[in-house]
Amino acid sequence: MHTLEMLLLVLLLVPLAPGEGDGQAVGGDRNPSEARRAYKRLLQRPARRMDRGGCTPCGPNLCCSEEFRCGTSTHHQTYGEPACLSY
């Protein structure tokens, strides 16, 4: 058999990859209400205690490491809030 024929034979014998057509949601296939529940569950987790060793306090819940400086965010969603800036 030629190489091309062997390759086609192998491709015909290989089953579908897992996740393809087996009914399981992957990535973008997730139900929006399921994603919302997961996000709310994430928000309800207790906050971790901040380790302020070796950093500069830059707001009530923000601590900048030594290579960054305190400033205000220019991002459209967090404009004017405290932020760690690299310049």
From Swiss-Prot:
The keyword Lipoprotein does not apply. It comes from Conus caracteristicus. Its main location: secreted. It comes from the Eukaryota. The presence of a 'disulfide through disulfide knot' structurally defines this protein as a knottin. The cysteine framework is VI/VII (C-C-CC-C-C). Belongs to the conotoxin Q superfamily. This is Conotoxin Ca6.2. Residues 1-19 form the signal peptide. GO terms for cellular component: extracellular region. GO terms for molecular function: toxin activity. It is found in: Secreted. Residues 20-52 form a propeptide. Disulfide bonds join 55-64, 58-70, 63-84. Expressed by the venom duct. Keywords: Disulfide bond, Knottin, Secreted, Signal, Toxin.
